[in-house]
């Protein structure tokens, strides 16, 4: 690389390598963002389930899977204690209000992580776009 008059000269190979690295980073960040969003939705669903159990009538329909392909009809679920995932495979049997607080904290952490990942993703996409524009201009100049 050479620098003169505030202009930097970079080889096309370096730009292509940088674009490839950014593309891989973008793919990884998108995957991570999707996983965090899925975890966030799961935490929200868990909170909704706790609220549903607390206010249940006689019968309750619970989804046996994530998509609701199988529903279970349940009667009279004891609502004094629930099991909540503490992470790393550990669960605690606690009162629903405590579980809701834990889920609120988890939701807050996931929202913060989602914002951080989204910001990193936007930066990577902007950098990739700039490199792509430079490569397009270089290709047009070579064609002339």
Swiss-Prot record:
InterPro entries: PFD_alpha_archaea, Prefoldin, Prefoldin_subunit_alpha. Transmembrane segments: none annotated. GO terms for biological process: protein folding. The keyword Chaperone applies. GO terms for cellular component: cytoplasm; prefoldin complex. Gene3D superfamilies: 1.10.287.370. It is found in: Cytoplasm. SUPFAM superfamilies: Prefoldin. GO terms for molecular function: unfolded protein binding. It comes from the Archaea. Belongs to the prefoldin alpha subunit family. Heterohexamer of two alpha and four beta subunits. This is Prefoldin subunit alpha. The lineage of its organism: Archaea, Thermoproteota, Thermoprotei, Sulfolobales, Sulfolobaceae.
